[in-house]
From Swiss-Prot:
This is Beta-1,4-galactosyltransferase 6. The keyword Methyltransferase does not apply. The gene is B4GALT6. Mn(2+) binds at D230, H323. It is found in: Golgi apparatus, Golgi stack membrane. High expression in brain and adrenal gland, lower in liver, lung, colon and peripheral white blood cells.
Amino acid sequence: MSVLRRMMRVSNRSLLAFIFFFSLSSSCLYFIYVAPGIANTYLFMVQARGIMLRENVKTIGHMIRLYTNKNSTLNGTDYPEGNNSSDYLVQTTTYLPENFTYSPYLPCPEKLPYMRGFLNVNVSEVSFDEIHQLFSKDLDIEPGGHWRPKDCKPRWKVAVLIPFRNRHEHLPIFFLHLIPMLQKQRLEFAFYVIEQTGTQPFNRAMLFNVGFKEAMKDSVWDCVIFHDVDHLPENDRNYYGCGEMPRHFAAKLDKYMYILPYKEFFGGVSGLTVEQFRKINGFPNAFWGWGGEDDDLWNRVHYAGYNVTRPEGDLGKYKSIPHHHRGEVQFLGRYKLLRYSKERQYIDGLNNLIYRPKILVDRLYTNISVNLMPELAPIEDY
């Protein structure tokens, strides 16, 4: 009888353990599905700790080798014959002096004296009334946040596109930070907030396509920045102009411990010329919910023969504005779409998009409100 009781106790414990682990795993899977962005951040933080530990071990090993090498000093300033010192020396970048004289007939330089580098990023909430009052003193800002320098010819005319839904507390912080920085960089710019209405899952990529089309109707732009509203640059030398290749500006996010999550990461803030964006047929429209659209954009860029450039060193650091909203649910169909990126590139994008926007021009930005639905971007079989 006592043996039977012990067996029952063991059986009950096993059952309770099974129920506990089943409940725990189910809760974890549900959390990953409904809040994939947060779950992904936590996962990468754990991975980043491992990466940092391995890098520290490598650094210690390298310092020991330098110390024991007769031809090397501890700080690495003297190198063994034939060694490539470019791995150790950082090339300095010269910026123009304070007394530099601008010319309204010449292009604005890219390395201006007012670009100091590190920015003190303040993510404290501020009201739109305060922001409007602050920038009302700048009479050069036209409706829609359109600004251009007067002391030189802007090297780039930049349309900043911001996909948006229910982040009203972020917009004032964003403008408070970005407007002065872009003015320092002597770029011509304006802001377009593309707001998704309705009940469909958030479609960041389709919003960018809508914003691009409307911005092209509004003015003559040659550079487009695709910018998440909760990402703030920490360095004003991160120049928001475009180049011969597409640019990934947000290479080091604080929420990822300032480490690039993976080589093909193209999220947060990116920039393409108008010609480049049209050549790749824009973003895909088929990604509803969280994840995948940036990876598809990376594929499109490479299929079109481009490479992606990134800022050097700490220039690509960004701070994320904290938010209290539940993130979008995970888009489980993204893996199939990514598998057929090449086949879909020229049948899903700028060329198959239908929409009806409502446009409101604010003092600091143009608001493009649109109710997105899958039938607005029909896709042929591939």
